[in-house]
Amino acid sequence: MDFNREHKINFLYVLAAMVGVLLIQSLVSQPDHIRTIPYSEFQQLASQGKVTDLVVGPTRITGTLKDAPKDSPRHFSTLRVDQALAQSLTNENVTFSGEPEPGPWPTILGWLMPIVGFALVWMFLIRPMSMGPGMDGMMSIGKSKARVYVEKDIKVTFADVAGVDEAKDELKEVVSFLRDPRSYGRLGARVPKGVLLVGPPGTGKTLLARAVAGEAGVAFFSISGSEFVEMFVGVGAARVRDLFEQARKHAPAIVFIDELDSLGRARGSAFPGGGGHDEKEQTLNQLLAELDGFDTSIGVVLLAATNRPEILDPALLRAGRFDRQVLVDRPDKKGRAQILEVHLKKIALAPGVPVDDIAALTPGFSGADLANLVNEAAILATRRHAENVSLDDFTQAIERIVAGLEKRNRLLNAHEREVVAHHEMGHALVAMTLPGVDMVQKISIIPHGIAALGYTIQRPTEERFLMDRAELMNRMAVLLGGRAAERLIFADVSTGAADDLAKASAIARSMVVRFGMDPTLGQVAYEPETTSALGLPNGSEWRPRQYGEQTAAAIDAAVRELIETASACAFSILQANRGLLESAARDLLAKETMSGEELQALLSQLGGGAASASVLRDGGDGAADAGQDRSGEHRALTVEGGEAQ
C-alpha cells in the first residue's frame, strides 16, 4: 500500500474542511444589525442630538440611534476623521466613551480556535474510526487486516522447526522458488499457486509458514480467515482484493491465511436444506477469482493452514488453486525427540536427562503439547527451588497434563478410598495379564482434575496404526476391569466406572457398525465416520440412519454381547487373582501412588490370562485402522479413572 499517497489524501480532506470552517466563520462574524454610515451623516445626527452610547476608537466610532425607524438597524458605525470630535460632542451634550484599538491577538485567536477545534475532533474521533483497532476502521473497512512482517522481522527458520521433516522438504521447494522465481520456468515447470498445510491443532503449521518466509527472506502477510468477513456486505471480497494487491506490491512475498476453513467452507453447507451464508460465499468467490488470476512468476506464494480439510470447497482444492497439500501430522517418537531438543535449549536441564525417554513417555503429543510440557516441567522445578530441571519434573508434568491437577483437598471417606483403590488396581491387573495391551506406567488414588478420583496411566511400547479384533476386545476388558473389581470385592458397582463404560461402549459400537467385526451382522459399515481424516470430530450435521428397526435391534444386541464378553474376561482374571488384587489394593491405599516398576513386581504372581485371552479371540477376526478409529491416536497415553459424581 502507498502510505505517502494515503496520508496526502487525508491531508487534503483536512485542508478542505479547514477552509470551509474559515469561510463559515467569516460569514458569521459579519454582523447584519450594524449600519455603516458616512462621517458627515454622523456629524449631522450628532448635532441634532439623535445619537447616544457612542464608543470612540482610534479609527472607528460605533453607537446607537435614538429614534431609528422600525425597519432600520438602531446601531451604526462610521470611520473617525475628525480629531476635534471630543470637543464637538461635549458642546452638543452627547455621551460618549473611548476604547483602545484591540491588538492582533483577538483576531488571530478568532481564526485559530475553529482550526484547533476541528483538529481535535479529527484526532480523537475521525482518525480512530479510520485507523484504530478498537473501532475496526469504519473509513478503512474494505482494507485488508493482514499483518505485514518485512524480511528483518522474521527470525524463524527451518532450524526452529523439528519433527516434520517431510513437510519441511516439501516447503524447501517454495523457498527456492522465492529466491529465484525464473529458474522454475527454464524447463516449463510451474510452481503451485497455493500450498495448503493440513494437520491437527498444535502441529506447527503456522510456524512452518513463518519459517518459509524467514528462510526466503521475503515479506510475510499473515491473516486469519475469520478476519475477512464483517457485518457489512461486500467487505470480505474487498479485503481479499486489497490483500492480493498489497502482496503484489511487496513481491516477492508470502501470503498466509490461517484457519482457512472459516473462509473456504463448502458453499451451500450452512444449512442442511441448502442456501448458505451469502457474504461468506461472496468472499470465497473473490478468493477463487484472485487465485485464477494469480501470476506466480511475480514471486508471490499463497500458503494456508487448516485442521478441517474435509469441509473445504472442492473448487478451492482443485488443480491450479490450492493444488498441493502438505500433511503436518503429530510427530512420531523420533520427531518428538527432535522437537524436545529444540525446546530444551531454552531451559536449565539437569545433566544426563535422556531425551529419548521423555519422547517415549509422550505418545500422541503434538509440537505445542511438547512445548507446554517443557514449560510445565520448568515451572515445577522452579517451584521446588531446584538448580535445574530433572526427569522427575517431566514425569510430574506429564501427569498434570494427562490426568489434571492433584486435588488433595477433595477428601474421600474410608469406604470410597477402598472402592477407588480396588477399581484402579483392577484396571492395572487386567492390563498386565492380557497380551498386546499397553504397559501400565502408574496408578494413583489421589483425586485429579475435575472429576477423576484416581487414575491408571498406560504407555504404549511402540507406534501402532492398526488394531485387530483381539486387541480391541482386550482394550475393552481393561476399561471394564475397574468395574469388575468393584463387583468382585463389594458385590456392587459404583458411579465411578461411568466414563470407562462409555469408552468401552464406543469401541464395541465401532466394531459392529464401522469395522464389520460382528459375524452375525457381517462386513457392512452401517454408520459413517465420526471423525475426520485427522482424527478430529468432523462436526457434520446429523444424518438419518440407513438401516431399519430390526437391524438397529441386532446392532444393539451385538454391542451388548461384546461388552458382556469383555466384562466376563476381566471378571475371570480378577477372580483368579483375588488375593493379589486385595493385597495390591492395600498397598495402594498405604502409598496412594504406585509406579510401573512396583507393579512389574506383581507380574510373576498373576495367572489366568491365557484362558481369558482365548475367550476374547472367539467370535471372528479382523483389523481396525487405529489411524481412522482414533480410539487411541498413535496409541497415545491411556488414562482410566474413577469418576466423581
UniProtKB/Swiss-Prot annotation:
Record region (Disordered): 612-645
Signal sequence extent: none
Domain of life, per lineage: Bacteria
The UniProt record lists the keyword Transmembrane helix: yes
Entry note: cofactor: Binds 1 zinc ion per subunit.
Keywords linked to the UniProt accession: ATP-binding, Cell inner membrane, Cell membrane, Hydrolase, Membrane, Metal-binding, Metalloprotease, Nucleotide-binding, Plasmid, Protease, Transmembrane, Transmembrane helix, Zinc
Membrane-related topology note: Multi-pass membrane protein
Localization, UniProt: Cell inner membrane
Listed GO biological process terms: protein catabolic process; proteolysis
Its biological purpose: Acts as a processive, ATP-dependent zinc metallopeptidase for both cytoplasmic and membrane proteins. Plays a role in the quality control of integral membrane proteins.
Name the UniProt record assigns to this protein: ATP-dependent zinc metalloprotease FtsH
Annotated organism of origin: Paraburkholderia phymatum (strain DSM 17167 / CIP 108236 / LMG 21445 / STM815)
Lineage: Bacteria, Pseudomonadati, Pseudomonadota, Betaproteobacteria, Burkholderiales
